[in-house]
Amino acid sequence: MAETKNLLLFRKWDLSDVEVVDPGLKTAISLRKQILPYTFGRSALKRFNKADVNIVERLINKSMHFGKKYAKNTGRMTGKKTKLINTVKTAFDIIALKTGQNPVQVLVKAIEFSAPTEDTTRIVYGGTTYHVSVDVAPIRRVDLALKFISDAIKEATFSNPKPIEEHMAEQLMLAANNDPSAPSVKKKNELERIAQASR
């Protein structure tokens, strides 16, 4: 048990110093200590096990699938987890050089600022469909934040000669500063604005 105290992510970053400020996300963001963020899909066996998966691995997993934009998704980054682990590792080095902070803390801040608190759902009442504002569950907040961040990274890299590592570092730093120009923060604000209009 004494050995787990010295486990550093990528043998560089200490996760014990990382703090989740948002009380709603404390249970949904896992900062479990491990050297390599790779659990070989063990979390897929039970429904909410993904909440126990290290947040860095969840970012990597989310980055492996772009969504349903066919032209940009075909054959790109699908299943290339080792490649993405190295990408995240390099992006974290860039973040550490530029900010002087623990890059995992920057990632957690980026998730906190990109996670929407309100969303809309459809309710059919008397044959008429209404959009109603609802609160978002903590796990879904993290899911949406990771989706927004990974989509922003891939949108930035598409048809761009700059390497993905630099784009990833840039997008995470923008989101961590709650920059309104960050695509992930923009999407979160847009979602909350639509939800507020549907109250």
Placement of each model-derived feature along the sequence:
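Strongly charged
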Residues: 1-85, 89-199
